[in-house]
Amino acid sequence: SDPFENQTADASDAGLLSPEGLPSNPFEFLNHLNNASNAPIVVLPMLHGPLGEDGTIQGLLEVIDVPYVGSGVLGSAAAMDKSFAKTMITAAGIAAPRHITMKNPVLTDLTDIGDRVADELGFPCFVKPANMGSSVGVSRVDQPELLSAAISEALSFDSTILIEEAIHGREIEVAILGNDDP
């Protein structure tokens, strides 16, 4: 018999399912979870950006021995750094859009950067911060003269940026929830 069959919880159960009254700081929230007398059976992290998508929360959940669903610490951390993720993907032989990674680019060298992008990637291209969640700081650049603004935007989020060729086609995202015996 399944001990969790027909088990339910609602938002009034110690406020654990409701953000009201809970700490907004992820570390304080995890401390709250660790000390709760009726801690959840499993956490479904639905967080965005640094601390939420980079493996930090997953690592802290592991430290306090609270199970969670989704990607683990290593997968989350590796995917958050777009430059590192591309290195891993291409090393595994998986095709990925061509890209240029730039650390602390100097905006006075924009002519050189624009020439390099035109030669190696072409336009349109995408400029994005290396470490940001979702599409935060991402710009589509259709013409070389728009590159400066896109680089400035990406640099406002991270000192390392990626400039990536545009790929035409469908984008498909797949979330997988499973176990060792799918």
Identify the meaning behind each predicted range.
Residues 1-69, 73-74, 78-84, 88-91, ...:
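ATP-binding N-terminal substructure of ATP-dependent carboxylate-amine bond-forming enzymes
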